[in-house]
Design a protein with these regions (language model features):
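Hydrolase catalytic cores
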Residues: 239-241, 260-264, 288, 400-476, ...
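Surface-exposed binding patches on compact interaction domains or structured appendages
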Residues: 501-512, 533-601
Length: 625
């Protein structure tokens, strides 16, 4: 941004240039994306010529070059030259370098840096026999109660996987890498040793540094140096939840952590240019999972949206899982003039999903409250957790994890509570690592290639997730999938199931969700169950057909199950047996009836959502739902 001197001239990076009346010569930061195959040197020369044709004394000053996830530049130039830059041969798009913030936390309890508070959840965390057969279960059971309760909710206390040999990247505000939480030695062979870490730093063309076995690569993309020390507590808390190795244990305690600091040390803003630089490097660093607990309002800039969507797609194609916070924006009606904090029933679009959570390639994570009084199955979704769907009607979020009242590491050696989808997301980043560890090491999946093994991780996580019953509704109705996605992650199920679902014709076969679009006459979709074991598996089918309740002209955030009471859901069979080493397809038909149609017509003149779940309840011992 430009500063104005006392003489009325603009000062940009210490240089002075004549001010124009319309401000078009003001120098701004922008991102320029080039078309595939464009010669970058020739394109930059043409860009400079285009700028000079309008502002003879100006040029395009390049601060970054992108070469891996996309081709382009971060540069500074007069704002009035942007259209000319867009017109240069080989330029795909050009847009202002926006700033993002880390996802704002939800309503936090008072910080508890002393390490007190929280109930002991160990009564639900397994027997002595479990601990003897699974030493990791014993280690998890010895944790602080607030950490254990969140992990018991996800049944992470039942798993033996630790993320050994896996790498997660934390794109955030930086991490206190000297924190005792990260000081323990890793079990297993690390994916990145000091030699490979040095090689990777050379490959990405920056001076990123190998800090330790736990932190094989760290770089400050916002300020352009090796000091990835935190700007605030956020990144350290997130990293701890994903992969702490101390007694305050993360989901994947043996995973290595790449630290990509993208927030400025002053102000904490995250420039697009820094975020894109980190993402561009991920294509070379190739972590198994990337955590992005950050976001902004969706749909602010179509050129930026198109570029980011392409970058996320490119990383997914490379077998990198992107776990992203859904946002903490409640519902669309929160804070409106009604005083009810509820959306008007005149508009069914109550989505508040932000970017990048709205993009198709990412795994968008919703938040549920940590059951601090013991993980007993009676849970509550976090009010602040944003509702889907995406602007183009894709079903989001994908999955839920504990994000309300999460206890984890903060800079300076302490621990404290934080709340937000930012805190739920690293639970899933750790989950992606441990489930991938299972898939890569389990002979049952040996016939899959490397990319298929990455993809099946999300089939397993979403396929074994447990839909959360809404305690505010009664009658056993679930929260809408627009609030919770597939449900609460069940890591015991995801690390033991030998059957996984796919939805036929889905845009992404690794995401078992049926996105059926608009309509009033009904829908059909098919689900295929794939069995990789030598044992047949039998399931009984059930469903809920949910629609949000309407009271006094407002959507309430709670849903009624209309199945059999205004909506018909039928299956091609009430039970299904999946043969050993085989697959079986089940057809599902959904038909709204007159009773439901009349209710919608009377209460939601612009229409409403009909969503829900199809459940496959296992009737085979040892096989999870």
């Amino acid at each position: 941004n430009a500063l104005t001197s006392e003489e009325g001239e603009q000062v940009v990076d210490g240089e002075t240039q004549a001010s124009t009346d319309d401000g078009s010569s003001r120098v701004v930061d922008m991102i320029v994306q080039l078309k595939d195959g464009t010669d970058t040197a020739a394109a930059l020369a043409s860009i400079n010529s285009a700028v000079a044709a309008i502002y003879p004394d100006a040029s395009a000053e390049v601060s970054r070059e992108y070469t891996n996830a996309f081709t382009g530049f971060a540069l500074s130039a007069p704002i009035g030259s942007m259209d000319a830059i867009r017109g240069v041969s080989g330029v795909q798009s050009a847009f202002l370098d926006h700033e993002t913030q880390v996802s704002d936390d939800g309503d936090d309890p008072p910080a508890d840096a002393e390490g007190t508070g929280g109930a002991d959840a160990s009564a639900d965390s397994g027997s002595a026999a479990d601990a003897e057969s699974n030493p990791m279960a014993a280690m998890r059971a010895a944790q602080h109660g607030d950490v254990l309760s969140a992990q018991v909710m996800m049944k992470a206390d039942k798993i033996s996987q630790t993320g050994a040999g896996k790498v997660v990247a934390i794109i955030d505000t930086g991490v206190d890498m000297s924190h005792p939480a990260f000081s323990g030695g890793l079990h297993g062979t690390p994916a990145i040793d000091s030699s490979k870490g040095a090689s990777l730093a050379q490959q990405v063309g920056k001076s990123g540094t190998y800090v330790s076995e736990k932190f094989p690569f760290a770089y400050d993309y916002a300020d352009g140096d090796n000091d990835a020390s935190p700007a605030g507590a956020h990144g350290t808390h997130v990293a701890g939840t994903a992969a702490n190795g101390d007694q305050i244990m993360g989901i994947a305690p043996d995973a290595q952590i790449i630290v990509a600091k993208v927030a400025r040390s002053r102000g904490g803003g995250i420039p697009d240019s820094a975020l894109l630089a980190a993402l561009d490097d991920m294509a070379t660093l190739h972590p198994d999972a990337v955590n992005m607990s950050l976001g902004r309002t969706a749909g602010m800039d179509s050129d930026a949206d198109t570029l980011f969507a392409g970058v996320y797609e490119k990383l997914q194609e490379k077998g990198i899982t992107l776990d992203v916070a859904g946002g903490n924006e409640f519902q669309a009606g929160y804070g409106n003039k009604s005083g009810k904090n509820l959306p008007y029933a005149s508009d069914p679009d109550s989505s508040t999903l932000g970017e990048p959570g709205s993009f198709a390639p990412v795994v968008t994570v919703a938040s549920i409250e940590n059951a601090r009084n013991g993980a007993n199955g009676n849970y509550k979704m976090s009010d602040f957790s944003s509702w889907g769907v995406s602007p183009d009607m894709r079903l989001k979020p994908e999955v839920t994890a504990p994000g309300g009242n999460i206890y984890s590491s903060v800079p300076g050696g302490g621990y404290q509570m934080m709340s937000g989808t930012s805190m739920a997301t690293p639970q899933m980043t750790g989950a992606s690592a441990v489930v991938l560890e299972r898939v890569q090491n389990d002979p049952l999946f040996s016939s899959l290639n490397d990319r298929q093994k990455v993809d099946v991780v999300q089939n397993l996580i979403m396929g074994t997730a447990v839909p959360v019953v809404d305690p505010g509704q009664g009658g056993g109705a679930y929260y809408s999938p627009r609030k919770q996605g597939a449900g609460l992650a069940n890591l015991e199920g995801a690390t033991t199931s030998s059957v996984y679902p796919t939805v036929n014709g889905a845009a992404d076969s690794s995401r078992p969700k049926a996105e059926l679009g608009d309509g009033t006459n009904g829908w059909h979709f098919d689900v295929t169950l794939h069995n990789v074991s030598d044992t047949p598996a039998t399931y009984e089918l059930s469903s809920q057909a949910l629609s949000e309740n309407i009271e006094g002209g407002f959507f309430t955030g709670h849903s009624t199950d209309w199945n059999g009471k205004g909506v018909s859901v039928s299956f091609s069979g009430s039970s299904v047996t999946v043969p050993a080493k085989g697959e079986t397809t089940v057809g599902i038909d959904i038909k709204p009836g007159n009773e439901f149609a009349q209710y919608v017509s009377a209460n939601a003149p612009a229409g409403t959502f009909l969503d829900g779940f199809v459940r496959f309840t296992s009737r085979t011992n040892g096989q999870p739902d």
